[in-house]
A protein has these predicted regions:
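Short loop/turn motifs at secondary-structure junctions
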Residues: 73-76, 210, 387, 404
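Short beta-strand-loop/turn "lid" adjacent to the catalytic site in phosphate-handling enzymes
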Residues: 67-105, 133-137, 168-190, 213-216, ...
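A short local loop/turn or secondary-structure capping micro-motif enriched for an aromatic residue
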Residues: 36-39, 108-110, 306-307
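Residue-level signal for inorganic ion chemistry
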Residues: 25, 48, 80, 107, ...
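Active-site core segments that coordinate phosphate-bearing ligands/cofactors
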Residues: 7-9, 111, 118-131, 135-136, ...
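N-terminal glycine/serine-rich phosphate-binding loop of ATP-dependent small-molecule kinases
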Residues: 1-100, 128, 156, 229-230, ...
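Extracytoplasmic ligand-binding clamshell segments of periplasmic binding protein
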Residues: 210, 216, 247
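A structural motif corresponding to the C-terminal end of an alpha-helix
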Residues: 203-210
């Protein structure tokens, strides 16, 4: 049993996980708590920042209590670091209370501001500065939305802060401070100087004094206040170190700290990334600062990942009564269906698409459906579509930066699927290593805490020492590679073939909703 531990705290969209890690990266104890989210109207998603804090307190108390059950005292905790949901923005007044509900990364209310601001400032210049193509996800456009649509809230907001900055303030007091890898997803950081972009701030009419102070990964942000120690069970004056965005922390947690591998999180959304020593920006990815403090993460993201599979099974197969046996049956049946799902091809953009098209009016498409297809065909076609989209994005990334990867490191619930693992290996032609680490983001934060505690001389060294073993390695079946290459070439043509039709249907649906709303008011 470990006698000294660090805590990696992952404050994600739906819950907080506080996990105590040993020097070898073994999870010793954990605490968890949910975070509620509201959906007040179409395309709007909000949270109360105080819920982040209460969830954090509950998770930390649970972790400390489990440590105590194992005979590990609070003073054995040597450091803490936070991984957090990215691109979620809190608005706080001069008393540190919310002046407006926090806008969550899923929110799309600022679509008009995306168009107007990018046209006025220049879409290419925004991309060059921030590393992010113009899209509704970065917080950049939410500042503009609040200023235009909620002027009183804009006036009453003293600080605009990310999740980490908010939690660090609650833990340690003092000024608002955050890690660079939490700041950069806000969309207003100059990615080459790693500082708030003065041109963007000027265009937003936003003073830098209203933003957190940026610190490098592994920097000491503060120490736990005695009152917080009493509330959580943490030792007073425990050092809290700068970690950051959950995506970058997940990459660190899988030890994707060198350029020969890509991590891929087969979760609700599918997120994949590679490390690069140099700054590159391209529509095929969004560029993030790397968690180890050197270089960048080139990241692609498919919003509708495993969500699509769960949605299909829940809505059309199990009718709200899905369990493991349903997925096992579909997996077995789908494994016997030929590549291409007997003529089915899916476009998995059920929630719009980020890279490489950056089109929020894109929608899902099932092409080739006939009466001879069953539920297992659609199940397989969904997995094929998600896989092909990721292979396409990664290959485009490799070509653009002249950097070839040798293998994937897979995490997330989808990595438990033998069908999905083999499909990714076969379609990419690269081995797929499955990480034993179930909570890669919390482990990444734990690695940064371990560096802060002085266990290792660098964050990279901590990652190499603490990353879990790859107990499953799936090799590609070369006999089917040509079939997947042919299917990928067809898939690449699908978006362009249906783009205008999708746009027309989105516009038509919006018009009908407005007509129905008007009719309801008149009635």
């Amino acid at each position: 049993m470990a006698d000294r531990v660090v805590i990696g705290l992952d404050s994600s969209t739906q819950s907080t996980k506080a996990i105590a890690w040993s020097r070898q990266g073994e999870a010793i104890a954990e605490g968890r708590a949910a975070i509620p989210m509201s959906n007040p109207r179409l395309d709007c998603f909000e949270q109360d920042p105080t819920d982040w804090w209460q969830s954090c307190v509950t998770a930390l108390k649970g972790c400390v209590a489990e440590l105590a059950d194992k005979g590990i005292a609070p003073d054995s905790i040597e450091a803490l670091a936070i991984s957090n949901q990215r691109e979620t923005l809190a608005f706080v007044d001069s008393n540190d209370d919310a002046s407006y509900p926090a806008i969550v990364w899923l929110d799309e209310r600022s679509r008009e501001e995306v168009n107007s601001f990018s046209e006025a400032f220049g879409a290419e210049e925004i991309h060059r500065i921030s590393g992010r193509p113009v899209d509704v996800t970065p917080c950049l456009y939410r500042y503009e939305w609040l200023r235009k649509n909620e002027p009183d809230a804009w006036k009453n907001t003293a600080y605009f802060v990310d999740v980490q900055a908010y939690l660090v303030k609650k833990l340690c007091g003092g000024e608002y401070r955050t890690g660079s890898i939490s700041a950069d997803p806000m969309g207003i950081v100059d990615m080459q100087s790693v500082s708030w972009s003065k041109p963007l701030l000027q265009a937003l009419q936003l003073d830098e004094s209203r933003l957190p102070v940026i610190h490098a990964p592994g920097s000491l942000l503060g120490s736990v206040m005695p009152s917080v120690a009493d509330e959580t069970g943490l030792p007073a004056n425990l050092g809290v170190y700068a970690a950051g965005g959950d995506g970058q922390c997940a990459g660190l947690g899988t030890n994707c700290t060198i350029s020969d591998r890509a991590y891929i999180n087969l979760g609700t959304a599918v997120v994949s990334g590679i490390w690069s020593p140099d700054y590159h920006y391209n529509s095929a990815w969004r560029t993030e600062l790397a968690a180890q403090g050197q270089g960048y993460i080139l990241e692609n993201c498919l919003r509708s990942g495993a969500f699509l599979i769960d949605w299909f099974v829940d809505q059309f197969v199990a009718r709200g009564k899905a369990d493991a046996s349903v997925f096992d049956r579909l997996e077995s049946q789908a494994s016997d269906i030929p590549i291409g799902s007997d003529g089915l091809l899916v476009q998995p953009y059920f929630s719009g698409v980020m890279d490489p098209h950056w089109d929020m009016s894109a929608r899902g498409v099932i092409l080739g459906l006939s009466g001879s297809h069953g539920e297992a065909h659609i199940y397989r076609a969904l997995i094929e579509a998600i896989t092909l989209d990721q292979v396409m994005s990664t290959e485009d990334m490799e070509k653009a930066v002249d950097q070839e990867i040798t293998h994937y490191v897979a995490i997330g619930g989808g990595a438990n699927s033998a069908l999905w693992r083999q499909m990714l290996a076969d379609a990419s032609g690269k081995p797929v290593h499955v990480s034993t680490t179930l909570e890669a983001s919390a482990l990444g934060a734990g690695m940064i805490a371990a560096f802060g505690a002085g266990w290792y001389d660098s964050i990279t060294e901590a990652a190499q020492a603490m990353a879990g073993e790859h107990t499953i390695v799936v090799e590609p079946d070369k006999s089917v590679s040509e079939s997947y290459r042919e299917l990928l070439s067809i898939y690449r043509r699908l978006y362009g073939a249906v783009r205008d039709l999708n746009h027309d249907m989105v516009a038509f649906a919006g018009k009908q909703r407005r007509l129905n709303s008007t009719k309801a008011v008149l009635d």
